[in-house]
């Protein structure tokens, strides 16, 4: 009888120990989860804009989407027209087709490029209505994920030298941050011309 009681007591002790350990582990997990939440930086519009400005800078978006003025070290983005796209109208000079077979041609502001696709002009990315002022976030992400003009399913493809296949690899949060930043920029009123077909550019 004593052995039976001792065995029952041992089983009861083990059961209490298991429950206690389980509760302790659950409490530790809850505390760790709580600490993680406390340590996470909340995503705010201000932090997204800051992140977007950083991404636009390191991705070199100003290289093509900001027209240039001549500085002491050469062309530099015009601070009054940042991200306003191509100024100056479409290409008018005729180009030797043999040259296009070997090179891509750029204007001095690097906002216009000529190649086998014709002439392409850098888009206005500022917050103005002539830029992306009326765009939705979904449009913006769709444009860069699928390479579609204005993010429209039936739109024409984005033309070189826009490196959208590279940008498409960014995370959704990165693209949303870039969009938030662009929407916060100074509006630059500038309607960029549509692409010029190659046949209109080559010398006959």
Name each model-derived stretch.
Residues 70-141, 158-171, 201-204:
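Gly/Gly-Pro-rich "capping" loops immediately C-terminal to redox-active cysteine motifs
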């Amino acid at each position: 009888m004593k052995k039976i009681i001792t065995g029952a007591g041992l089983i009861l002790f083990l059961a209490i120990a298991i429950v206690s350990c389980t509760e302790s582990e659950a409490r530790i997990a809850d505390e760790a989860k709580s600490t993680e939440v406390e340590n996470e930086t909340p995503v705010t519009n201000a932090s997204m804009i800051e992140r977007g400005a950083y991404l636009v800078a390191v991705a070199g978006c100003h290289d093509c989407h900001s027209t240039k003025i001549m500085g002491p070290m050469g062309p530099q983005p015009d601070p009054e027209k940042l991200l306003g796209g191509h100024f100056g109208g479409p290409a008018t000079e005729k180009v030797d087709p043999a040259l296009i077979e070997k090179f891509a041609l750029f204007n001095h502001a690097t906002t216009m490029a000529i190649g086998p696709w014709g002439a392409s002009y850098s888009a206005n990315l500022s917050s103005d209505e002539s830029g992306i002022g009326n765009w939705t976030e979904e449009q913006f992400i769709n444009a860069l994920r699928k390479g579609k003009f204005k993010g429209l399913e039936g739109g024409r493809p984005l033309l070189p030298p826009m490196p959208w296949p590279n940008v498409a690899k960014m995370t959704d949060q990165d693209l949303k941050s870039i969009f938030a930043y662009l929407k916060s920029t100074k509006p630059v009123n500038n309607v960029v011309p549509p692409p010029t077909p190659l046949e209109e550019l080559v010398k006959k």
